[in-house]
Amino acid sequence: MTEFKREGSHLSSCPPVEKWNDWVEYDPEAWPRRVARHYQIIPTICFNCESACGLLAYVDKETGKVAKFEGNPKHPASRGRVCAKGPAVINQIHDPDRVLYPMKRVGPRGGGQWARTSWNEVLETFGARIRKAIQEGRGEEVMYHVGRPGYDFIMERTLQAWGIDGHNSHTNICSASARFGYVLWHHADRPSPDHANARFILLLSAHLESGHYFNPHAQRIIDGKMAGAKLAVMDPRLSNTASMADYWMPSYPGTEAAVLLAMAKVILDENRFDAAFMKNWTNWEEAEFDGFQAKGQSFRAFIEALKRHYAKFTPEFAEKESGVKAEIIVKTAREIAAAGSRFASHLWRGSASGNLGGWQPVRALVLLHVLTGSVGTEGGHSLNAWNKFVPRPFKVPPPQTRWNELLYPPEWPLCTHEMSMLLPHLIKEGRGRLEAYFTRVFNPVWTYPDGFSWIEMLRDEKLVGLHAALTPTWNETAWYADYVLPMGYSSERHDLMSQETHASKWIGFRQPVLRVFHEKQGKKVDYTYQTNPGEVWEEDEFWINLSWAIDPDGSMGIRQWFESPYRPGQKITVDEYYGWIFENSVPGLPDTAKKENLTPLAYMRKYGAYEVTTDVYKLNEKPLPAADLTGTEVQPNGVITKQGKPIGVMDHDKAVAGYNTPSRKLEIFSKTLVDWNWPEFALPEYYRSHVDRSAQAASLGAPAADFDPKYMPLVDWPKDARGEVFTLLPIFRLPTLIHTRSGNAKLLYEIAHKNPLWVNPVDAEKLGRLRTGDLVKVHTEIGFFVLHAWITEGITPGVVACSHHLGRWRVNKEDHLERFSSAWVDLKEVGKGQWKMRQITGVEPYDSSDPDTRRVWWSDAGVHQDITFPVHPDPLSGMHCWHQVVRVERANKEDRYGDIFVDTNLSHAVYQKWKSLARPAPGPGNLRRPLWFPRVARPADAAYNFQK
């Protein structure tokens, strides 16, 4: 029974920890009878986004089933509060259509014929394939491709134990441009704003309702506002976040950097900047621009040169580019300057992920922090590495010595992460093949642009030898796999997660709650699939066992990394893996656990999270330990080096850590961009996006003075494309959905199941007095899609928008492919590379073990837009630039809702056009990539050199 008790000035509805072993509530389904139910409450971590919020699973002691999920108040980031996606985990684990047993293809790929198999058969098959590939020197043909990981470090460790360069991710369709902008400044590839303590907050996002870490961030944004902070939002769309802002700046897509640099100009011209911080903590002395060389010059001379450089970015110029009023730009700039070191901001996807050069707004945004001295400060902008904690396991393999050009091709030497969206095109060009391919939390056929090119690659057994989809549910990509391997949801597996949610370092512990429940009842559990539904396994145990299958006798040197640190020569267990970490790698945890007479592992199983430290401000000023200074040299610029590598910097007379950049300072001037053939962008700059109005005009052959083909690829329309030209925003999120992971959460799709095209009333008139509900046809560079219009003043004129999450589909009516959210479609290849899709029926009620499937009242599954987009790789960051120049017209009589057409021949031509913008490696020293840039599963330094 829920207890409400007063704690200070707040009411608490969460059971106290001391009652988690036997919590009693009345059964709501038995009402009005008072039937008591006894629950074991077990903490875990949500995985319906990357926030890693804490959950409490209520396990019914009588039935042994999970009854519900609520927030964990002991979690430092989410603090007991979760969004709609947290409680929806109950829908996912009880989904009647989920995959419960390992399945093997028995017909042609994509044919939909499957037979149940065993985990042993899976391990033997893949173990033999991978062993042979490694022994024959074909390790680069083994690839692990993950969407959102939900773990820290364990897969990098596994792949490096195998000695391969085989880690691929979805980051370059997610956040690579933002990461690139942050890396250039301070090496850390993500921001960590201290919203709660800020005086002014600037969001280039809809971050109160959606996006990366939005639940813990939204809490702290509101904390900041309650304490008096003002909020500004730059977004072309009137989101719920924008509606809460003190200043809404509906900028035209791709012009954000112009607005931010105009703000920087105001702060510079009015001398409102923190000169001491800039002089001490930027590499201004290395700057060379516009004929100015800082070496030997004064800091004041540098500032005057900087003012001259940014003189063109007047508020009036920014207004002309963006549509944001000049007076609002000036007012916001002065608010930022007044906030000083307590200015916080956030830009992660949005404009960064949508636009060519989307990393430039990040460079400009951090410039505002540098001008105000709000880097690493209370209420300011911090580095993710300062607020994230990744403990090391008992034994770490050496880095691999090979470089996989399917992951990091030489055309994009500065790309932030793997060029994953190009994989079908790279393989089509004959650059390689895949012998063993694992996809995990990864559905590129649906989530990626150009999904039909993925189908063409995945169905070809000469290109992809063996494909396993590690997934809890059927999805569009799994349909083209050889094996579908059921992996657990949030509450069905082990993981460690830590995220930069606020001014703190913490870890969260995901655990399979039914396994923990049965072990508490005294049952011996060897593998997690023994307590999960069906034979649903978990990745940690799968990779341990697969590694033993690859190297059964240890002769390859792989097995040693998966042997117990406590029982030499024996296979490690998950308890041993995490137990060792908690005992040895988490500062303070053993002592905290000891106070409760618990082992560190038992403590984490009890509470689910642990706060490591809140001492996270100004870590650049942290003194270097005396032991680290042995054998070091101080360079003329103050950088402290050891064996030729920077480890710190002199701060006046103190040896301190600094930032992890070549200068050990914030790099206002990027010598890296100069050295790697992009000198024009050495300072934070603005250049026009591929969706700029000039690009629209050029696509029609009209005069376009601002169109620069050196940076902006020309849009070539398919011959049947008609209609008015717009910029399409295809990536805004809905608060209740997340990519395709939430597709089987029935209550989330009851809330949101339609993605109409947002059209401003001014534009609706141009399209022939378009009304809400009218069918429109949206033409892209490679095809079209048909959907309903929604006429709203909540979108900037000249811009249309469509939410990312919806439009799931299945090719057979009875396929168990998330029938709450998918339409049954007729999919045909009508010519070489020419694909047509037509919806036969939308969502319908159906019979299953869940009576709610008969109560489905909605019929709309939305329309799949991503599959009609070509790849747009940014020439520097490698990010897929999501925004599209499109043509919109009223649908024709033969068009139907949900119709899709794509020509993959055109998509490959667009890929080649964008590839031509790149400036390939090698860089200085015959390098493939700057050695100081971060890289997941980083190889040894020697692998960075092109082999002669």
Model-derived regions: residue spans:
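Short, solvent-exposed secondary-structure boundary/capping segments
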Residues: 793-806
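Short beta-strand-centered aromatic/proline hotspots
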Residues: 787-791
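Long, C-terminal catalytic modules of enzymes
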Residues: 512-610, 831-862
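N-terminal export/assembly segments and adjacent metallocofactor-ligating motifs
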Residues: 1-273, 325, 438-440, 484, ...
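Extended redox/cofactor-interaction regions of prokaryotic respiratory oxidoreductases
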Residues: 155-223, 227-232, 258, 366-483, ...
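Short conserved beta-strand and strand-loop elements enriched in small hydrophobics
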Residues: 772-782
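Long, well-ordered, tryptophan-enriched scaffold segments
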Residues: 228, 232, 237-340
